[in-house]
Regions:
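Active-site gating/metal-coordination segments in enzymes
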Residues: 81-84, 89-152
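Alpha-helical scaffold segments that flank or form the walls of functional sites
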Residues: 16-27, 33-88, 112-130
Length: 152
């Protein structure tokens, strides 16, 4: 059996010790686009992530599951670079967290499904990386009508 990593399928027998819920970065895309390096210094983030996860690899970690959802700044290019440099299997996610976002209210279930399935079939952010997990997080208020639509 295989699972998708950001660098391609990995046999589950080769996953080794797994960090199940990590976030290489949580950096809002609208902030990144509007403020650039004043808000997000990609090279520094990459170096920091490689340093920290490189230490984890030295301690026996072989796989990292990055649960950063689309709307919290998931960055597959960062994940791919960290995977290449550290030798770790990095598993990306697709899906949303606290989905009370206005744009979701204007989409029907099929459109939301198509967005997420595009990650799974076409790849994430213009790459051939595909998600290995589906993120489905909700707020303390529970499943609202909008969240019910998204989760469905």
């Amino acid at each position: 059996m295989k699972i998708q990593s950001v660098l391609g399928p990995v046999d589950t027998a080769d996953l080794g010790q797994v960090l199940m819920h990590e976030h290489l970065t949580c950096a809002d895309w609208s902030m990144r686009m509007n403020f650039g390096s004043r808000f997000y210094e990609g090279d520094k983030v990459t170096e920091m992530a490689c340093g920290m996860l490189g230490k984890a690899a030295q301690q026996g970690v072989a796989t990292v599951v990055d649960g950063t959802p689309v709307n919290l700044g998931r960055d597959v290019h960062l994940m791919r670079e960290v995977a290449r440099r550290t030798g770790l299997n990095i598993i990306a996610s697709t899906g949303f967290y606290y989905q009370e976002e206005p744009w979701l209210g204007f989409r029907d279930e099929e459109q939301i499904y198509d967005l997420l399935m595009g990650d799974c079939t076409d790849g994430i952010q213009g790459t051939d990386s595909k998600p290995g997990i589906l993120k489905a997080g909700v707020a303390r208020a529970g499943v609202t009508p909008l969240l019910n639509k998204v989760l469905h």
